[in-house]
Amino acid sequence: MPLNLQKNLPAIELLKKEHIFVMDSLRASEQDIRPLRVVVLNLMPLKITTETDLVRLLSNTPLQVELDFMKIKGHTPKNTPIEHMQEFYKDFDEMADDFYDGMIVTGAPVEQMPFEEVSYWEEITQIFDWARTHVTSTLYICWAAQAGLYHFYGVPKYDLPAKMFGVFRHSLREPFVPIFRGFDDEFFVPHSRHTEIRREDIMKVPELTLLSESEESGVYMAMARGGREFFITGHSEYSPYTLNDEYMRDLGKGLPINKPRNYYRNNDPAQGPVVRWRGHANLLFTNWLNYYVYQETPFRREDIKKLGSL
C-alpha cells in the first residue's frame, strides 16, 4: 500500500528491504486523494521496533495512510534516541485539536502497577477521552487494552502466577464481525504479559462484546461502540523474533522466565521460532482499516465528533 510516512523515518528503509511499498510525504502529496490519518500513541520501550512492526501491518491496504506518532508529555524514553523523538513525535497538547480516522495505543511496561500509580495515568486517560470525540476507531493493545477497559468500563486486571508468554491458539465467539473477515476458525496470537482480564468481568458490561478468547491465554479481544473501540490483549503486531528477544533479555537479567510456549521449533531456542500468526495479523489490521476506519469515517474529519456507535 502507499503508506505515507514522514521522510527519514527509520522504518522506511527497513521495510523497503522487505519489499513493502512505502512513500515519503513528498511523493504522497502528488496523489490527489483524501488519505486516512492514523495516529499511534507509542508507549513501548523500543519505539523504532514498534513503529516498524505497525507500519509493516498497516501496509496492506490500497488506500493512502498518513501516520503520526504521539508521545506522553515530559516522559523521556530510555531506549530511543532523543533526536528520533524530537523529529517524529508530538505531545498530545500539540495534537489535541486534530481529528484522526484511526488510532492505535500500544502496550507499556507498567502492567504490574495499579493504574492510578502509573506516572502518566492522568494524561493517558485524557487522551482516551479525547479519542472518543476525535477518532473514528481506536485499537487498544495489551496494557492499553487493560487500561481502556478499566477507565471506560471499570474492568479490573489481575496478576498472573507466571507470565503469559508464548503463541496461543484462539477461537472466534463472533465470527461474522467484519474485523474477522477471512479469519480461520482458529488462529494464533503471541502474548507477553504478567496480568489478565477475565471473561466474567467483560460479560458483566452490556456495552462490551467479547469477540475472541483462548483456552490457554484467556480473553483476546473485546469490542465497544460498534467497533469504535477494540481492546486486544495479545501482540499480533510482533515480528518473528520479538518473543525470543524478550526471553533472552530476561535471561540476561537473571529474571524468572520460562521459554515462550508454542514458539520455538521443537521447543529449542537454537532452532528459532515457528511463525504462525503473520497471516491473521495482516488480516486484523487490514480489516480494521477497511471496515471500521475507511468505510465509517466521514469525509470531513471534523464531523468525527458527531459520530455515535458504528
Curated annotation (Swiss-Prot):
The active site is at residues 142, 235, 237. GO terms for cellular component: cytoplasm. It is found in: Cytoplasm. The record marks 111 as: Important for acyl-CoA specificity. Signal peptide: none annotated. Its main location: cytoplasm. One of its GO terms (molecular function) is homoserine O-succinyltransferase activity. Keywords: Acyltransferase, Amino-acid biosynthesis, Cytoplasm, Methionine biosynthesis, Transferase. The record marks 192 as: Important for substrate specificity. Pathway: Amino-acid biosynthesis; L-methionine biosynthesis via de novo pathway; O-acetyl-L-homoserine from L-homoserine: step 1/1. It catalyses: L-homoserine + acetyl-CoA = O-acetyl-L-homoserine + CoA. Its EC number is 2.3.1.31. One of its GO terms (biological process) is L-methionine biosynthetic process from homoserine via O-succinyl-L-homoserine and cystathionine. It comes from the Bacteria. Substrate binds at residues 163, 192, 249. It is an enzyme of class 2 (transferase). CDD domains: GATase1_HTS. Gene3D superfamilies: 3.40.50.880. Transfers an acetyl group from acetyl-CoA to L-homoserine, forming acetyl-L-homoserine. Belongs to the MetA family. NCBIfam families: metA. HAMAP family: MetA_acyltransf. This is Homoserine O-acetyltransferase. It comes from Parabacteroides distasonis (strain ATCC 8503 / DSM 20701 / CIP 104284 / JCM 5825 / NCTC 11152). The gene is metAA.
